[in-house]
Structures are given as C-alpha cells and as structure tokens.
Amino acid sequence: MSDDRRNRNAILFLGPEEIKGLISMEEAVAAIEQGYREADEYPIGNAPRRRVHSPDGVRVSNFPGGIPGLGVIGSLTRAEMVSQEGENQSYPYREHPVYLLWNSKTAKLDGVMMGEIFDQRTGFTSIMAFRTGATTGVGVKALARPDAEIFGLFGAGGQAVNKILAINAVRDIEKVKVFSRNPENRIAFCERMGTMIDKEIVPVDTPEDVIKGSDVVISATNSNVPVFDGSLLEPGQHVVTVVGSNSALVEGGWLKSGRRENDDETVRRADVIVVNHRESVMQEKQAGLYDPIQQGIISFEDVHALGEVLTGSHPGRTGNDQITYHFNNNGTAAADMALAKIVFDRAREDGRGMEIDIPVPGTQ
C-alpha cells in the first residue's frame, strides 16, 4: 500500500522483517547525536532506564522518553533471560524489543514496532544493534582527537561489528587492532570486517597490544570484570566501555559484585568522563563509575552527560594530551526514539506494515 493510501488515523504495526535495511550507520550516528543534544536541551523529556527481574532470571528493561524535534515520544521495552557464566554474562533467550511511538504534540499512538534480535539473522541493520554502536560513534566524534586513526578493540562479537561500522562513519580509519580471548574468533572476525569496510583490521595477541599506540580504545564485550589495565593508557587516548549493568543482579543473588569492563585506574586517569545518562550511574549503582565514586576516586560532579558535550554546556576534550573516557553506560530513549522514528517514517512511506484501525479512538 502506497503512503498516499494510508489511513493516518490508524495505528501502524511493523514487524522485524518490515524494518530491515531502512537506516544506515551514518544516519544512525546523526540521529542519535540529535537525540542526545535535545535530551540535554529538554531534560524532562527523557527518564532513566528502569529494570525489573523475575526470580527465574527474566529481566524487563524500559526506556521512556522522546525527541521533540522529531515529534515523537514513547518507549522501548524488551525482555531477556539473563545468565552468568564465569566472568561473562549471556542471554539464553531474548524476546523482540517493542517500540511504542506516540505523536509528541497530539498524544496519538502512531505506531508499534517489533524490533530485531540477533545480528546473525538480520545482518547488521538491526536498529537495536545500531544504537550502542552509533552512540559510541557520537562519542568518538565529539571526544577523540581530530586526527584519531588507530583504534584498539576488545571483543569480536556483534557489538564489536557495530563499533567498527560506527567509527568508520565518523573517522578515517587507518588500522583497527582486535583482541578477544579466543584466537580463532578474533582472526575470523578481522578477516570478515576487513572485507566489509576495506580497512586494515588485524588480530593482536594481548590486551597490551590493543592499547599501545592506539588513538581510541574501545571495549565491546559481555565481561563482568575489567578487561584491561588502566595504567597502560597513553596520553591523548579516548576510551570507551559499554557494560553498564544494574545493581539488581547483585541484590537478586546472580552476581557477587557489579559488572564493569573498566578498572579504577582508568577512571582515576581520565581527564574527562562522559556517560549517556548521569542519573543511571547512581540509580542503578553501575559499578564502572559508582564504585569509584563511593571510594572517593572521583565525585559525581566529575561525570558529565554526552548531551552536555554536544550542546557545548561542557567543553569535553580541551587538550590533545587529555585522556577522555566515555562510559557508554546504557541505552536511552533519546537514542531509541531517534532511530525508531526515522525507521517508522520510512516504513510507512514505503507502504510496509499492517494498519490497525481502533474502533474507539482516543478522545479530546
């Protein structure tokens, strides 16, 4: 059905197959940059992530908020089974994420989207997968040195793929050095990524090799414990970690301590510390920064939001020798709604999805 035949009063339902391939990583980075900028300009438009757990390990995460400039307000909700395997977290089962999109001016429910789950099934066009990678890209663009071209990467899974795609969208890559615990996995990953973006992607043997000489150091793992020694960091580097778990995993007895990819030394040496959402650090007791704050290594006032850097209310990097640290601590609706609105509009224009005409609409 073409867009001009659509019933604009109906709710549009989109399934996973109907939203594939509708946004590029370059567009995702631009959309999320707008989302975080608007989140800083209008802070009551987004709320911290909230999570609840069942006794059997099912976790439901909700991300409420909106982007006034795009005319959307809503939420992303997803459920998954969470399991701990040694020093790593895994997900034996994940359900499709559900996006609800309301018109931020009229309160009309415009659409319901069921997102993709696994990158191996959907390729690398999953808007859920794009979110974390593209947010890293926004941080690299804003905080890494302008001449950054050598990248060190921990991890060789789906998160790592989208990290490389994101940095390729914002910087001219000369080389990416990759370390993961399994040599065969990292070799295969590098071969695959090298052909995907036609850049030099090389496996390395130690964490030290990842950090030495890199302009940007990125961790993209499911680790529960620090993956590198912060004393190895070099002046001028930009550092990114992504594990920002919630304290309920400890309170519920699944973990003995909070998950974190960074160590205290990384936090101690960072001249600039940026997160996606400040309140989540304290509300969820996210160990990567919550623990150093409790120990007095830094104060909460040392932690700034990514949106502050984008709007200029915080200067971000002010010198080439500074170590900047982006704790990509959790998803936010600022990112989710920015991506979802673009995908939703394009799907509707392309005639995708199923219209649901509710007999009893909302009232004025």
Q: How should these model regions be labeled?
A:
Residues 197-214, 231:
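Short acidic low-complexity segments
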Residues 169-196:
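NAD(P)-binding Rossmann-fold cofactor-contacting core
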Residues 338-364:
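Phosphate-binding loop/pocket of nucleotide- and phosphate-handling active sites
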Residues 224-238:
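Rossmann-fold NAD(P) dinucleotide-binding segment
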Residues 238, 242-315:
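Rossmann-fold NAD(P)-binding glycine/threonine-rich loop
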Residues 128-152, 158-169:
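Short internal alpha-helix immediately C-terminal to a glycine-rich phosphate-binding loop
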Residues 212-213, 234-235, 269:
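Alpha-helix C-terminal capping/helix-to-coil transition sites in glycosyltransferase folds
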Residues 1-129, 147, 304, 334-337, ...:
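N-terminal ligand-binding/catalytic initiation module
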